[in-house]
Amino acid sequence: MLTDIEISRQASLQPIESIATAFGILPHELSPYGRTKAKVDLAITNRIKDNKHGKLVIVTAVTPTPFGEGKTVTSIGLTQGLQAIGKKSCACIRQPSMGPVFGIKGGAAGGGLAQVVPMEDLNLHLTGDIHAVTSAHNLAAAAIDARLYHEQRLGCEAFREQSGLAPLDIDPEKILWRRVVDQNERSLRTITVGLGEVNGPVHQGGFDISAASELMAILALSRDLKDLRARIGRIVLAQNKQGDYISAEDLGVAGAMTAIMSQAISPTLMQTLSGAPCLIHAGPFANIAHGNSSIIADDIALRLADIVVTEGGFGSDMGFEKFCNIKTRQSGNAPDAAVLVVTVKALKSHNPDAGSEMDKLAAGYANLSWHISNVAKYGLPLVVAINRFAEDTQEELEWLKARVLQEGVFACEVCEAFTQGAEGAMALARAVVRATEQPSQFRYLYETKQSIEAKLLTIAEAGYGANGISLSDTAKAQLAQLQRQGFDKLALCIAKTPMSVSHDPKLKGAPQGFELPIAELKLNAGAGFITALVGKVMTMPGLGIRPGYLNIDIDERGEITGLA
């Protein structure tokens, strides 16, 4: 079979204007970036606001292996399958970060015959939204250090007289806003800023990957430009020497940050290999952020399509949980059904020494059972999609499907979208249509009015199967500060490893009885949630020993090779 990029390059693509017209987007609501992608103007929302509201399907997965289990392949394949059975469908996915593209995981355009194309456009830059997030974020970092430098250089009163601004009295030891870059770069996790006599007071800093920026979460959760501006103004950047929070509005940088992101607020329209529309917007990671594409993209798609397919990053303990408890709270768009993607290889990875291949599959089934139970907590009709790989045997697939159906899920189908495209996902599509016609009893896992500790305990015990939580001294102090400043009624975003339903990547299957260690609590006032860093989670990934960039090149005709 051809590689993903070879398939993408050989595809017969429609002009993006044709995709838009068929989907219901008018010419003046489109700003093309070349022939195959375009920004969708937010003015469309007023025109379509009274259209019938479509059905929303959230795609999630079991605990993944490092290379992923084909959740995006299944999402794109399902969208194509829905189109093939006569449903007007649209996929809403995140913009890939270039960190994983050049690292081990590769791109996030799907794969095989279930791709968003051109895949190289999607995986490299797209329409520049991540660059806008990065620039706006780092402007705030520069503004903090500049203010700190000038106030310390002049003294508060002289600064007030010369600048006409009120001193902020920033505590250099309590700057909360790190810098970001869209790369995996472990050497930047901890840095020293301000070295040299004229470069400002020396203090510790660091870089996160751009997908971890609060601005990325804000982009994904904003309803319009006005909301984006207000949220950016609420971002907490630092504390003053009295312990009070300093916001982007206080620093006077919120307007400029929003101006940088003014084009990024519009989603990008692309197409799948079968010509189905796909809206790409925002790219927060699910392990260190909330892991879902934008509310704006969903809102547009739901007023134009019969069924909208979106996905949450990693397993159901990660992006799906945050979709339900963070995104849905803010959007008001409750899902109508869920699809849980599983692979034979993922289940085998939980017990690789169990004996025969069937023994490994049976031993690893506990992980799938855990995720089925987890989705059930939210009251959604569930379809399990077995994403077939070439090495899967018929015996394994039949055993797995029969076992899944014993769990009481709505349906279970084998998906072969990777090798067959729309045709390989039609059975899944029909099952999903039937699932969306069932009554949904969607519910949240916790109420935001609970205390921070109570919410943490609920997520740990009901969400992960833990036996309680522990808070570090740092987390305890931060919790007290959040309560004191009135931020204790926000939703929670757990940042943890995606390789286990626990905090420990070595705990495979369906671990129980562990204590969830809360290392740090970080306020994301603009995004509207508190991030709890659990265990040893990193907000800046590193490159592996054989990174993906080693395979990537470009020839004299401008054709990229080796992009996965």
Curated annotation (Swiss-Prot):
Keyword hit for ATP-binding: yes
Pfam families in alphabetical order: FTHFS
Keyword set includes tRNA-binding: no
Sites where the protein binds ATP: T65, P66, F67, G68, E69, G70, K71, T72
Enzyme kind, highest EC tier: ligase
Matches recorded under SUPFAM superfamilies: P-loop containing nucleoside triphosphate hydrolases
Record pathway: One-carbon metabolism; tetrahydrofolate interconversion
Reactions catalysed according to its record: (6S)-5,6,7,8-tetrahydrofolate + formate + ATP = (6R)-10-formyltetrahydrofolate + ADP + phosphate
An MF annotation (GO) of this entry: formate-tetrahydrofolate ligase activity
Enzyme Commission number: 6.3.4.3
Keywords annotated in UniProt: ATP-binding, Ligase, Nucleotide-binding, One-carbon metabolism
CDD domains per record: FTHFS
PROSITE patterns registered for this protein in UniProt: FTHFS_1 (PS00721)
Top-level lineage group: Bacteria
GO terms classed as biological process: tetrahydrofolate interconversion
Alphabetized NCBIfam families for the sequence: PRK13505.1, PRK13506.1
Family: Belongs to the formate--tetrahydrofolate ligase family.
Protein name, UniProt field: Formate--tetrahydrofolate ligase
Organism of derivation: Shewanella loihica (strain ATCC BAA-1088 / PV-4)
